[in-house]
């Protein structure tokens, strides 16, 4: 029987917490003026590579998102060095940052469902308005 949480998953969870702390306290890049949240980390099986998924608080502007990802990618060496001090790993993984749009898509889907429910309620209250003669 396989373990439910293997070492890569445990390291990814700890790394997610540590990167969030580093981004909050140590990174002072003006391109990251918006609040940055680490939404997930995926580790390779050999723990040599990590995909870090981030979201930004004010992510309406696509150029700001691209600039934020670029800033994080440029700071990845610094983040790795701080991560090496915070975590006890033989090899600190190479970090690659990706924008996670699942939060934005989830909110969009929620708004669509809310609008459909609202429209359906209006049709139930006023059934005569929707009939055509």
UniProtKB/Swiss-Prot annotation:
Gene Ontology biological process terms, A to Z: maturation of SSU-rRNA
GO molecular function terms noted in the UniProt entry: ribosomal small subunit binding
Keywords assigned: Cytoplasm, Ribosome biogenesis
Cellular component annotations (GO), alphabetically ordered: cytosol
Keyword Nucleotide-binding recorded: no
Locations listed in the record: Cytoplasm
Highest taxon of source: Bacteria
Described purpose of this protein according to its UniProt entry: One of several proteins that assist in the late maturation steps of the functional core of the 30S ribosomal subunit. Associates with free 30S ribosomal subunits (but not with 30S subunits that are part of 70S ribosomes or polysomes). Required for efficient processing of 16S rRNA. May interact with the 5'-terminal helix region of 16S rRNA.
Subunit composition and interactions: Monomer. Binds 30S ribosomal subunits, but not 50S ribosomal subunits or 70S ribosomes.
Family membership noted in the UniProt record: Belongs to the RbfA family.
Name of the protein in its database record: Ribosome-binding factor A
Organism of this sequence: Salmonella schwarzengrund (strain CVM19633)
Gene that encodes the chain: rbfA
């Amino acid at each position: 029987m396989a373990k439910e949480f293997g070492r890569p998953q445990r390291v990814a969870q700890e790394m997610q917490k540590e990167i969030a702390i580093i981004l909050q306290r140590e990174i002072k890049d003006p391109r990251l003026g918006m609040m940055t949240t680490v939404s997930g980390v995926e580790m390779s099986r050999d723990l040599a590579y990590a995909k870090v998924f981030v979201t930004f608080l004010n992510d309406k502007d696509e150029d700001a998102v691209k600039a934020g990802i670029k800033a994080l990618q440029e700071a990845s060496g610094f983040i790795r060095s701080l991560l090496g001090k915070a975590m006890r790993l033989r090899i600190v993984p190479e970090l690659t940052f990706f924008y996670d749009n699942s939060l934005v898509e989830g909110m969009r889907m929620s708004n669509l469902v809310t609008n459909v429910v609202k429209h359906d309620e209006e049709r139930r209250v006023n059934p005569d308005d929707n009939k055509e003669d």
